[in-house]
Amino acid sequence: MFIMHHNSVLLHEAINALNINPSGIYIDGTFGLGGHSHYILSKLTSHGRLIAMDRDWSAVNIGEVLTKQDGRFSIIHAPFSKMLRCIYNMNLVGLINGILLDLGVCESQLTDSSRGFSFMRDGPLDMRMDNSVGQSAYEWIAKASQKDIEWVLRTFGEEKLSKKIARSIVLKREVYPIDRTSALSEIISDTVLYYNNRYNRRKHPATRSFLAIRIYINEELVEIMKILQDVFKLLAPGGRLVVISFNSLEDRIVKKFINQYSRVFAYPPKIPLTHTQLLHKYSGTMKFKNLGKIKPTVLEIKKNIRARSAILRYAEKLIYM
């Protein structure tokens, strides 16, 4: 039996939110180390099916082991923004009973210094989820203008000292290549602590900047917006969308999307609309039932500090669409 020792955030809450049909078809759009997938499979009968996706080859390699152990499971190497295309090729569009997206960085990506995600571990400055394509963080920092660096730090990291940090990076890269996580972390930390003596020491000074660069390099927010626009086509009537986000930018996108498609336009009384017109207006704007949000318990946060910023939002596709 496949078992992966991994503390998946909001594990039980996410699977409960999917409202598993034992013979249904489900998608884990962010396989990672397989924590959520393993739990979903435990809820399915032999007639059920789970399709996983991940753009990280190391995750796909783990998933391929599971495919040999469980015929109900398959995994695809692709970002979840390509989900509609992949599911179309499998003739399953409109038949999916639930989609789960865990938007957090996998624990193994943070602890593997060679991936370059963490300012706590020295390694090559890469940060790519799929290191077989695209530019690395080092390559981008080496050629990006000061203005572009500032924009990324401010937009994706909400870093108040973005201008000063960008200036420091541009000055330092003229002296030596910023190709290690430790080098970038030191530049950012020195800048933040120099200009802000009252900085909250409980949070590492490089936290926001590393987050911003990672989001930019992997186009993470674009990925989220793309998949959200496709979920209506993918889900079966009554199918569930469950998204776990880990920062305010991600959560804002998910919250806005669900709210936008779970509202009904309120028409003043006595407006002369026929039943058909009302139904058209209603179904054209309301496609989801907003089922709310869930946050980790204090106990889970104590056991897994990564859970402290997690927010789970979920919704159900309306049957009459």
Swiss-Prot record:
Cellular component terms (Gene Ontology): cytoplasm
Main location: cytoplasm
Reaction it catalyzes: cytidine(1402) in 16S rRNA + S-adenosyl-L-methionine = N(4)-methylcytidine(1402) in 16S rRNA + S-adenosyl-L-homocysteine + H(+)
MF annotations from Gene Ontology: rRNA (cytosine-N4-)-methyltransferase activity
Domain of life: Bacteria
Keyword annotations: Cytoplasm, Methyltransferase, rRNA processing, S-adenosyl-L-methionine, Transferase
Places the protein is found: Cytoplasm
Stored SUPFAM superfamilies: Putative methyltransferase TM0872, insert domain, S-adenosyl-L-methionine-dependent methyltransferases
Binding site for S-adenosyl-L-methionine: G34, G35, H36, D54, F80, D102, Q109
EC annotation from Swiss-Prot or TrEMBL: 2.1.1.199
GO biological process: rRNA base methylation
UniProt xrefs under Gene3D superfamilies: Putative methyltransferase TM0872, insert domain, Vaccinia Virus protein VP39
Protein family per UniProt: Belongs to the methyltransferase superfamily. RsmH family.
Function: Specifically methylates the N4 position of cytidine in position 1402 (C1402) of 16S rRNA.
Protein's name in the database: Ribosomal RNA small subunit methyltransferase H
High-level lineage: Bacteria, Pseudomonadati, Pseudomonadota, Gammaproteobacteria, Enterobacterales
Gene name for this UniProt entry: rsmH
